[in-house]
């Protein structure tokens, strides 16, 4: 089974009206850092071009959401 991208999984959860924890990347003096906080229906995930690379960001997001939803079993 193909692994869905975290953004798609998050969007599906939002569409179902689920309230869950999300990751927002905020700019700071060093470029960006991960902020782990609550997001609600309709929230967006922000990324910074200065933050490592897209693959790392996606893996990090996926790991955090797996911790929340109990992983892909």
What are these regions (language model features)?
Residues 1-36:
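Short N-terminal "domain-start" leader segments
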Residues 24-25, 46, 62, 69-70:
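Residues marking helix boundaries in flexible regions
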Residues 1-5, 66-73:
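Short intrinsically disordered terminal tails
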Residues 11, 58-69:
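Residue-level detector of alpha-helical secondary structure
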Residues 42-56:
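A short, exposed loop/beta-hairpin motif centered on an aromatic-Gly-Thr core
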